[in-house]
Amino acid sequence: MGDNMDFSEHYGNFSENYVTESYGEFDLYYDPLNETSLSEQGHRSIWVLSIVLCSIACVLGITGNAFVIWIAGVKMKRTVNTIWFVNLAAADLLCCVSIPFSIADIILNSHWPYGEAMCKILPSMVVLNMFASVFTLVLISLDRFALVILPVWAQNHRSITLAWLLCGLVWVLGLLLSLPSMIYREIVVHDDMNITLCIYNHLQDKTEGNQSAIKAIHVTRLILGFLIPLLVIAVCYLLIGRRVSSGRFKSQRAFQIILVVVTTFFVCWLPYHVIGLVIEYGKEASQVMARALDPLAISLAYVNSCLNPVLYVFMGQDFKERVRVSLRKIFEKVFSEDVTLRSSVYSKGQSQLSRATNSSEAQV
């Protein structure tokens, strides 16, 4: 095969060599005539759409998340809420910074010109973003749960210092869970094709132990990075919803924004995990199709990193207000502590504390 490899011959393994995380086996000599696969035109369409989505995510994500960090982290008074949103924006910004390398990787038909160090670092940044983002969303949900369900505890323990410590813990856990990506990634040079690939080394080392380790990594990623956070967040908002619907708290726009942000995260990352499972455990025909669609799933995960600032703008004000006020005012309203909620929490906390005191005095 010559230096200028035909698009259809190489694109079949695109998803397995893509700069972000890949899951299963890949076939370097993909057969475009395989009836279970997509046509060459289908691959080209996925190729173009992936570039478009990544480009949009890059431009909006870098500018939007940088603006969020500037507003919530620099211009506004430091609160627990602003710390959560700054941490979420920092995770998304980190991911968006790596997108240009991904776009170049797509354009170069998965050729990896950046060396082995970057092969280990860049894919790991995407995994780190996933864990840091979802763990931050869990913290936000638990924080809202404490404010509504455990107001006395929130009044006594909810602090900026604790928020910073928890955000630090999020990054430590994210880094630890991203380490396998660094360990198992390496570059493979194919001189006959004039191409260098960034892949998992289990694609070269097919020993049973190595294969099992990779599968364990992906299952762990699915459970800790998707299923458990989804369960925790769902339970938190189910209980919050019951309390709000009881009429004891007014429905707050802040809750609506956070719910949409959480829902968007899981919708954007669901295809990534589903396709990964199909590639790892599905039948051969399903694996081929999943590999072909994998770039779209990865691009959709990238898009999630640019959506939050957009959601803050479109949900932070009514439409007429959005026209009249500056973006800074919109963001400040989104990130500010909810006065009505805090008043309700404080009143309920005082009421509970008063009842507890009266009960103690009666017993004496």
Swiss-Prot record:
The keyword Acyltransferase does not apply. It is a multi-pass membrane protein. Glycans are attached at N13, N34. Disulfide bonds join C119-C198. Residues 72-82, 142-159, 242-256, 317-364 are cytoplasmic. Signal peptide: none annotated. One of its GO terms (molecular function) is complement component C5a receptor activity. It is found in: Cell membrane. InterPro entries: Formyl_rcpt-rel, GPCR_Rhodpsn, GPCR_Rhodpsn_7TM. Keywords: Cell membrane, Chemotaxis, Disulfide bond, G-protein coupled receptor, Glycoprotein, Membrane, Receptor, Transducer, Transmembrane, Transmembrane helix. One of its GO terms (biological process) is chemotaxis. Residues 1-50, 104-120, 181-220, 278-295 are extracellular. PROSITE patterns: G_PROTEIN_RECEP_F1_1, G_PROTEIN_RECEP_F1_2. SUPFAM superfamilies: Family A G protein-coupled receptor-like (SSF81321). Its main location: membrane. The chain crosses the membrane at residues 51-71, 83-103, 121-141, 160-180, 221-241, 257-277, 296-316. GO terms for cellular component: plasma membrane. Receptor for the chemotactic and inflammatory peptide anaphylatoxin C3a. This receptor stimulates chemotaxis, granule enzyme release and superoxide anion production. Belongs to the G-protein coupled receptor 1 family. PANTHER family: C5A ANAPHYLATOXIN CHEMOTACTIC RECEPTOR 1, CHEMOTACTIC RECEPTOR. This is C3a anaphylatoxin chemotactic receptor. It comes from Oncorhynchus mykiss.
